[in-house]
From Swiss-Prot:
Enzyme Commission number, as recorded: 3.5.1.88
Cofactor(s) recorded in Swiss-Prot or TrEMBL: Fe(2+)
Name of this chain's protein: Peptide deformylase
BP GO annotations: co-translational protein modification; translation
Family note: Belongs to the polypeptide deformylase family.
Family annotation (InterPro entries): Peptide_deformylase, Peptide_deformylase_sf
Species, as recorded: Helicobacter pylori (strain Shi470)
Lineage: Bacteria, Pseudomonadati, Campylobacterota, Epsilonproteobacteria, Campylobacterales
Catalytic activity, as annotated: N-terminal N-formyl-L-methionyl-[peptide] + H2O = N-terminal L-methionyl-[peptide] + formate
Length: 175
C-alpha cells in the first residue's frame, strides 16, 4: 500500500467531473486500499478518488466507532454512486482534506438512499442518515467537481477566501 498525495484547493483538478468505473480489477482494488491508507493517515473520514488525482467515480468513507477507532471492516467503498432518494435538510459543520483548516456549516439532506457498486462490481443499496448521509453527499459532490465551500453563503465564502489568503501568506499560523 502507498500513501497518496492529497490535492488541495484551489487546484483545478478538484473541479474535474469523474468518470464511471467499468473495470473492477486488481488495479482498482489497490487504488481503494491506497485511498483508505491515505485517508486514515490524514485523519479524515471520507475521501473521493479525485482528491488524490484519480478522476474516477469512487469514494471511501470510514466513520469511527464510539471508541474513536476507524475499523477497516466498517470502511465503505462506494463506486459509481447514484442517489435514489433524499429526505429533509440539516445543517452540518464540515471540513475537507482538500481544504485543510477550514470548517463551516453546510446545508445537506438529512437522509439519503444511494445505489452503488462495491469493489467486486456487486450492486448495493445503502440508506444513511446523520453524519454518514452528510459524508456521502460531501464525497459525491467531489465526484461532480463540487467542493463544500461552493455551498457557502456569499458572506461565509468571503470569510473563507480571506482565511485562505491569510493562511497562504502565513502558512505556519493554522497548523
Amino acid at each position: 500500500m502507498a500513501l497518496l498525495e492529497i490535492i488541495h484547493y484551489p487546484s483545478k483538478i478538484l473541479r474535474t467531473i469523474s468518470k464511471e468505473i467499468v473495470s473492477f480489477d486488481s488495479k482498482l482494488h489497490q487504488q481503494l486500499d491506497d485511498m483508505r491508507e491515505t485517508m486514515i493517515a490524514s485523519e479524515g473520514i471520507g475521501l473521493a478518488a479525485i482528491q488524490v488525482g484519480l478522476p474516477l467515480r469512487m469514494l471511501i468513507i470510514n466513520l469511527p466507532r464510539e471508541d474513536g477507532v476507524q475499523h477497516k471492516e466498517d470502511c465503505l467503498e462506494i463506486i459509481n454512486p447514484k442517489f435514489i432518494e433524499t429526505k429533509g435538510t440539516i445543517m452540518y459543520k464540515e471540513g475537507c482534506l482538500s481544504v485543510p483548516g477550514f470548517y463551516e456549516e453546510v446545508e445537506r439532506f438529512e437522509k439519503v438512499k444511494i445505489e452503488y457498486q462495491n469493489r467486486f462490481a456487486e450492486v448495493k443499496v445503502l440508506e444513511a442518515s446523520e453524519l454518514l448521509a452528510v459524508a456521502i453527499q460531501h464525497e459525491i459532490d467531489h465526484l461532480n467537481g463540487v467542493l463544500f465551500v461552493d455551498k457557502l453563503s456569499i458572506l461565509k465564502r468571503k470569510k473563507f477566501e480571506k482565511e485562505l489568503k491569510e493562511l497562504n501568506k502565513n502558512p505556519k499560523s493554522k497548523s
